[in-house]
Regions:
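Alpha-helical scaffold segments
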Residues: 1-466
Length: 466
């Protein structure tokens, strides 16, 4: 089986016919099942075979695929009872919205006899709003609590008022968390009720604090950094923490909205290049205020600039400014979150950034393509050379030349390119490192796909083997 290294790639080939895919599926190879489940489309015969496959792992891959048709995923509910849990959990890809299941599937899942299935369904990020809104009046408190957490913004004032006065304390707390920023009384109640909860710090940071409560929290010395981040914490009390021994507390004080640049500079704060900081809430809440964003983008304070960088409303002049910021995280956040991030910023971070997130920048719509062949075809860095095939003006001759590059990543990029001559695609199937990429090429003749399977010893008779 000298070419078995290339066989997996056929599972991702958009031109592979059902017969080829069914032969692959019969191998009971989990990686092949994964690649099949993530195809943009599946022939009906292959979809049916995966739905009814005796191996639970194959069905699970289908249930967890963000690319699989929601109707197809929902039909797993007609199979073994154990599949309901993976259907309920569903796909949860990073920063991607997954199309929801059909309503009938949610009805079955939310009325399932197993509590774990109901729980996973309620907490699945893909459950649509219209399914969750009616739960605000559900007889079972956990359902009302979920409605508070997930769709508060979609509830009417009357429904919200009812939830704020709900007989169940967990429901009341979930509702109160949404109004505490403007309600001192509910903030005080939450501080008492959640004193030993992980949500205590959230209340300290976001709740509306009366003077007496603020002074008590300061005196207790608990959660001082979240307390200092709360804009409702009186400025005169916050100033007492400016010289605190804990650097996290000093940093929180230095990033408060009422401070001038001079007042920030007077505090001994530090933000390291690897420090992970959440977006300052007061900046995010003011993201439609151009002047606030401009003040943050031009601040000497790193945290303010990082917070401005994630705001899509950041004005164009500030985008240009932060694209050249000396803090790597500022540039990366801008590249990740701003719809008008400069193409050259995306390219520079992709080639020179060390954070794992830079690899995802290449899929951004504004990632450059034109001119990359002339710039990088002969670059010493293989990551740069691989970009040359993104250039729409790259010639078939150049793509073929890159398909013979000593670097595996460059050869793989060329192997997937539609301009690569079919003759060379077939040759690359024998490449132990780039053969799998070549097998994904849509111009690969079906006869070559079949021949590859034959050489690899993949049985021609399709059968499910448990």
């Amino acid at each position: 089986m000298t070419t078995h290294h290339a066989v997996h790639g056929l599972a991702s080939n958009p031109a592979a016919p059902a017969g080829v895919l069914l032969r692959l599926l019969a191998l009971n190879d989990e990686w092949i099942a994964y690649r099949l489940s993530w195809r943009a489309s599946l022939p009906d015969e292959v979809a049916e075979a995966m739905l009814t496959h005796p191996d639970r792992r194959v069905r699970q891959r289908l249930a967890e695929s963000a690319n699989a048709d929601p109707e197809l995923r929902a039909r797993l509910l007609d199979g073994p009872a154990s599949d309901a849990l993976v259907v309920a959990h569903g796909p949860q890809p990073y920063r991607t919205v997954v199309p929801p299941l059909p309503d009938w599937a949610y009805e079955r899942l939310l009325n399932h006899e197993r509590s774990t299935v109901r729980y996973e369904t309620l907490h699945s990020p893909s459950v649509p709003e219209h399914v969750l809104v009616p739960f605000a009046g559900h007889t079972h408190p956990p359902f009302r609590e979920i409605a508070c957490r997930r769709v508060w913004h979609a509830l009417t004032d009357d429904v919200r008022a009812a939830l704020l006065g709900d007989e169940d304390p967990a429901v009341r707390r979930a509702a109160a968390l949404h109004v505490m920023a403007d309600d001192e009384g509910r903030t005080t109640e939450l501080l008492e009720a959640l004193a030993d909860s992980r949500q205590f710090q959230e209340v300290v940071e976001r709740g509306r604090l009366g003077r007496a409560v603020a002074e008590r929290l300061l005196a207790e010395g608990k959660a001082l950094a979240p307390l200092a981040r709360n804009p409702a914490f009186p400025a005169d009390l916050a100033s007492r923490l400016a010289g605190h021994d804990d650097p996290a507390v000093r940093l929180a004080v230095s990033a408060r909205p009422e401070l001038s640049e001079e007042e920030r500079a007077a505090i001994d704060w530090e933000v390291g290049p690897e420090d992970r900081l959440g977006t300052l809430r007061w900046v995010w809440d003011a993201r439609t205020d151009t002047e606030v964003l401009r003040r943050c983008a031009t601040s000497a304070h790193t945290w303010l600039r990082r917070s401005a960088a994630v705001c899509p409303e950041l004005p164009e002049d500030c985008v240009r400014l932060l694209a050249g910021d000396g803090d790597f995280a500022v540039r990366l956040l801008l590249a990740e979150f701003h719809p008008q991030a400069p193409p050259e910023l995306l390219l520079d971070l992709y080639l020179h950034g060390s954070h794992r997130a830079v690899a995802m920048l290449i899929v951004k719509e504004r990632f450059p393509a034109a001119g990359l062949a002339a710039r990088f075809a002969g670059a010493p860095d293989p990551r740069a050379r691989a970009l040359a095939v993104r250039d729409p003006e790259a010639t078939p001759e150049l793509v073929e030349r890159l398909s013979r590059d000593p670097d595996t990543g460059v050869r793989e990029a060329a192997a997937r390119d539609p301009r690569l001559p079919v003759r060379r695609v077939v040759e690359l199937l024998e490449d132990p490192e780039a053969g799998s990429a070549a097998a994904t090429h849509p111009a690969l003749p079906v006869a070559e796909m079949v021949a590859l399977l034959d050489r690899a010893g993949v049985p021609a008779t399709v059968e499910h083997r448990p």
